[in-house]
Amino acid sequence: MPFTLGQRWISDTESDLGLGTVVAEDKRTVSIMFSACEESRLYARSDAPVTRVMFNVGDVVESHEGWSLEVKIVEENGGIFTYIGTRTDTEEENVKLREIFLSHQIRFNKPQDKLFAGQIDRMDRFALRYRALTNQYEQHKSPLRGLCGMRAGLIPHQLFIAHEVGRRYAPRVLLADEVGLGKTIEAGMIIHQQVLAGRAERILIVVPETLQHQWLVEMMRRFNLHFSIFDEERCVESLADATNPFETAQYVLCSLDFLRKSRRRFEQAQDADWDLLVVDEAHHLEWSEDKPSRQYQVVEALAEATPGVLLLTATPEQLGRESHFARLRLLDPDRFYDYDTFVEEERQYAPVAEAVTRLLSGEKIDDNARKTLVDLLSEQDIEPKLRLIESSDADDEHAQTVRHELIDSLMDRHGTGRVLFRNTRAAIKGFPERHLNMYPLELPSQYKTAMRVSSMMSGSISAEQKAIKLLYPEDIYQEFEGESATWWNFDPRVNWLLEMLKANRNEKVLVICSRAQTALTLEQALREREGIRATVFHEGMSIIDRDKAAAYFAQEDDGAQVLLCSEIGSEGRNFQFSNQLVMFDLPNNPDLLEQRIGRLDRIGQQRDIEIHVPHLEGTSQALLAHWYNEGLNSFEETCPTGRAVYEAVSDDLIALLACEKHEPEALENLIEKSAAMHHELKAKLDQGRDRLLEIHSNGGNAANDLVTQISSKDGDTNLIAFSLGLFDTIGLNQDDKGENAIVVTPSEHMMVASYPGLPYDGCTITFDRETALSREDLHFISWEHPMIQGGIDLLLSEGVGATAVSLLKNKALPAGTLLLEMVYVVDAQAPKSSGIGRFLPKTPIRILLDAKGNNLSNKVAFEGFNRQLSPVNRHLASKLVNSVQKEIHVLIAQAEQEVAKELVTVRESAQTEMENSLQAELTRLQALKAVNPNIRDDELELIESQIQDLTGYIGKAQIQLDSLRLIVVSHN
């Protein structure tokens, strides 16, 4: 390379160094000083990774003194360029600027500048950049954004609720599904959508203390949302960074008790400007008109100060009407201002729900029901619709459509339809059956002796303490024998468990017991006696260790056959891949029993659940098993009445459990009384069901359509190819581990020091939803995952693939024929929270010009064209660019005219789509406001101002050249 002192060069590998100056050279080396960052580099002269900087006529260059010059003439003397032209500030002509006096800070940010400066990237990177832009655009435009990327099964009612609520601005809703239907996942999906759409940047989740870690893990594992748990210690630590500790994190998780106990922390939380508040277990907030609880007041104040609120609660039937009203009051105190008015309103909707039940079941609609429907939908003539439904076959497609139109209209007018979602198992299909297998086993003599001696020595303990003690004879035995007691050598439940596991070698078995020590002892017994692979899961383990245990259990090959859990194993972890549940002992209340079964009996479970209950005859264990089974039927069915019945009969039950000898008659009477109460309460709950609300909450066909649409996107080969190309370009190591899993780790040759979303020691990823669901240690990669979103942002911001030169081997065209491919981006500069991404995200426009300026982009698709091209080495690429620089300038100018026309079309299309969408919603809500007071004024005002703001942003959208590729036809 010919180097001369004073010449200006740029580094090909370190473009951020700015403009360099040759300060020394000899036969073998050259030294270049980069004054902008006060660094110098010594290169081997023969292959220095630098490019000569030469500006052309028409360019505007900056001097080191800060003034700019529009170049008219370029002169060269002794290898040094002098630029002659007009100063832009004083308009003085024929000003000379020698290249040594150019600004050191000049960087080549425009693609054409990079191309002319020889900063030419690889062809595959250009293609990757274009794909990144098009995929990013498609994801922003997708109505399913925020729903496809979560690590969860595709459950219709969950997706429907999340889709319905997640697209609203500042949603304020009550999620009141029955247990096991996935309220936490629904809330997570809503949060995820709000975050991706930019509607929620600051989120506060308030939960009972025991559920903090569960929520932390769920949000991180399922939605890649990283929350921080705030307690007193964290608040004190944060004081160094801010006066209000809650302003030091965007996503905060804390316990309700923490805010209740400290007025100062509560006030700080209240002042922290949240966009979205989520409250779990909201049914525990006690309220009465004259005396609301402190917890209720805390949530009420936070809800008042926060635009969006999600309350997760028990079903309205379980809550009772007054308590249900108190939750609604938190969401909209202006609308739900008086309890008696609310009760009267609810009463008026009862005949509507009855009419809808008849409508759906195909029963004849009597005159009363018909009158109810006609009165409520007075603004439309529904008589023809009713006649069509009654005269048509129940499966007739047109009649089905009309049915759903009627239901949608009714739902919009329903008292709480917009703010309350509630699904019941009775209304949702897809739950497996539960089969109970009871195994009465003989009580060992060792236990008999220990229990007798313990009874003599226990003195005056309460009946409740005694009852609990008698449920766990192994603990009583251990009290006398000490730590070295080997009760597992003679306990028949252990022998039964070993035989059961040997008989079911290919099954994954979940064993739950009340205490951590029991789980640890059983693991030792299984290992030492039969070499059975087992793992434990208890409260003494860290979250990471629990994750590892769960992953070991989930592993198909070489995984554990058994997971031994203490009671916390039935909190928040789901193991749907197993259908075998062993209860080594029994919990002392029905809610915990349901929680245990709920680890396997969840929506999405594919097989019937086998519940195994080994119990020692004549003990409290046996008595409790019979009461659960015959009094509540809580093994084989979910039991919404369990707590109410338990509280009513608990004195009698505890008295029986505390007896060493059980009277069969007393047990019989208790079971009879409990069963009668259970059936009576269940009938009442069933009668109180609001069929209209159920129909709305489960989403019907719309919910199934969502599942179909998302399923069709799962396993997208385009995503897999793009992701692997992205990781390769950034410099990540990839190691295929089989079983749909790839290990991704950082390398020494990465483009950046750390990669977004990738732990420093790497991670294992999968593109398969089912694999991700069965193995919690894997990251589920989708277009929404931080590793992909962050990778695309990195690729675009670092200018990767902004320029390229390729050869087209085509003998049908003359050799040397020139083509220029340019990618422009339409960008509306607007806050993310405005919702611009839904209508006008960054939009790529591809222009492919031949040498005559004809635009071939509509005739020549990108991928097919790209496959016909060959790469060119950088040295040859620079030569080609320099030889046709004038032609490229002309083509870029022609492309600007072409893309200006496209910009008008893109703006008009975005404006029309925005108006159609938002204006339709505004018109609908304005019409409904007359018949449904649940429509809030601020909702209408928000849509009106949004239409106005978006119109301004769309009208000001600009274009920018993002990347370009020179293509030269070759016959070689």
From Swiss-Prot:
ATP binds at residues 177-184. This is RNA polymerase-associated protein RapA. Interacts with the RNAP. Has a higher affinity for the core RNAP than for the holoenzyme. Its ATPase activity is stimulated by binding to RNAP. SMART domains: DEXDc, HELICc. Coiled coil: none annotated. Residues 164-334 form the Helicase ATP-binding domain. A motif (DEAH box) lies at residues 280-283. Belongs to the SNF2/RAD54 helicase family. RapA subfamily. SUPFAM superfamilies: P-loop containing nucleoside triphosphate hydrolases. Keywords: Activator, ATP-binding, DNA-binding, Helicase, Hydrolase, Nucleotide-binding, Transcription, Transcription regulation. The keyword DNA-binding applies. Transcription regulator that activates transcription by stimulating RNA polymerase (RNAP) recycling in case of stress conditions such as supercoiled DNA or high salt concentrations. Probably acts by releasing the RNAP, when it is trapped or immobilized on tightly supercoiled DNA. Does not activate transcription on linear DNA. Probably not involved in DNA repair. The gene is rapA. It comes from Photobacterium profundum (strain SS9). Residues 493-671 form the Helicase C-terminal domain. InterPro entries: Helicase_ATP-bd (IPR014001), Helicase_C-like (IPR001650), Helicase_RapA (IPR023949), P-loop_NTPase (IPR027417), RapA_C (IPR022737), SNF2-like_sf (IPR038718), SNF2/RAD54-like_C (IPR049730), SNF2_N (IPR000330).
